[in-house]
Amino acid sequence: MKSEKETIYDYAAELKLLAFKEELECTLSLAAEENWNHLQFLTELLGKESARRRECRRRSRIRSAGFPQMKYLHELVMEDMPKEAQVILPELETLDFIRQGRNLVLYGNPGTGKTHIATALGIKACQQDFTVLFTSVPVLLTQIREAKSAKTLRTLQLRFEKYDLVICDEFGYVSCDKEGGELLFNHLSLRAGKKATIITTNLAFNRWNEIIKDKVLVAAMVDRLTHKAYLVNMTELSYRLKETQKMRQDK
């Protein structure tokens, strides 16, 4: 016949209470030492289970977001960042722009930390229970075209709309025709004024017509994406180049 403890382990396994199962012995000992009553014991044990599940959800959100690599805000060397980024980053770190459904556009030279900032904000958002999608504009446009061909575009749109934060990296690396520009504009417009989107681009707004050959569409896209948005000019000496120079000096 099973002991009460073994029975508890079985119930915990059946109910997928992993922390409950792992922490039972330790919590029983602590309860005996502290002379806890039953409610105190259960509160402690269920608190550990709740903490474990929150951590699992955070890891799952980060994994599902699709970040190409892990980047964190504390890794940024603030004095090496462009001036505008230094000023606005403390406000962005609060993630209020996500709660307010405001966009963030990081534009400027390659290697200045745009993707690092976007990724780091996305990871912090996942850690604070926001749902996040990281994608590049070329990949997103391919997905939109494929969904349209497969007649599943509305399904893709509904999923895209629901994320608390979408990060669209590398806007401007690949040009697109008028149809592609319209598809991208319509897709991004689904979130306008409701959910936050981060755009990283190496092109200033007056050069967007180099990748989308329709001036009217470009004007509409700029207007839609920048309305009440944070616009951060990252045009400065490459952040990556500065890191390389420092490494050489340290040798």
Label for each model-derived stretch:
Residues Y9, A13, L18-P68:
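Interdomain "pre-motor" coupling segment immediately N-terminal to P-loop NTPase/helicase cores
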Residues D10, C26-L30, E75, L104, ...:
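Short hinge/gating elements
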Residues R57, Q86-K162, I211:
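Conserved P-loop
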Residues K71-L95:
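N-terminal pre-Walker A segment at the start of P-loop NTPase domains
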Residues L165:
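Short, Asp-centered acidic motifs that coordinate Mg2+ and/or phosphate
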